[in-house]
Amino acid sequence: AASDVYKRQYPDCSSKVLDQVNLSIQEGTLNVICGRSGCGKSTLLRHLKSVLMPHGTASGEILYKGKRLREIDHRTQSQEIGFVMQNPDNQIVTDKVWHELSFGLESLGYDNATIRLRVAEMASYFGIHQWFYKGVEELSGGQKQLLNLAAIMAMHPSLLILDEPTSQLDPIAASDFLETVKKINRDIGTTVIITEHRLQDIVPYADKAFVMDKGNVFLEGSPREIGAALREQKHGMFLSMPVPMQIYGATDSRDTCPLTVSEGRQWLERYCSCLLYTSPSPRDRSVS
């Protein structure tokens, strides 16, 4: 997926909600889009699926597998581009778990044998078989969002887009859900584009990160490159990065920036050892 200097302006609005957006997503990668609330993250994601695109005037092109997105029919987009929304209840359309898993495939006209096979695969992969016959009203928020994800993956999409999918979930359910997203990318090779406010659970595992501000993508690169750039610019988004990166940024260390807690612990041990080694002894201080 790629966009070529894309702009979007809402009706009766003088300012652009997206401005000079130019980015490229490599197939099979996990990509995180981050930025302050209202910077245009959700709007950008909705432009990656035509039926969700907001009204207004736009210029530029969005390409999917080398083709203009607006020229790709809705059926192909429905099957190949999966989209998980913020609120789990806004996406569920049936009353039973098993029916929700099969609904997308039924709508696309798959035969019963294929539907049964894919539903069984997804129920097993996501651990849904334990509540397969339950009504959706009996599910927790985390289970509902997992069901949405499984129903989308049953259609075997090439691109999975997630718009702050854990915003309605408790911390444990959110962590479990993001682990599943990482597993999908790692095991199946599905390209993932996600916006998420719990950056510590997803940024360290991303292949590429993008930072938005006022409708523009002003930084892109690996998580370490993004962290270093935000630190150098003293940008407010640095305080939303994973805690190990924040601690590293508060020091004068030139070592490799840690991303995970494990890396942070190892870096902190090296940093503290270096401080102890270079600090003057009490006798040296008294002489001075």
Protein language model regions, located:
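Conserved beta-strand-loop-alpha-helix hinge in the C-terminal portion
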Residues: 212, 216-255
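Conserved ABC ATPase signature
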Residues: 135-139
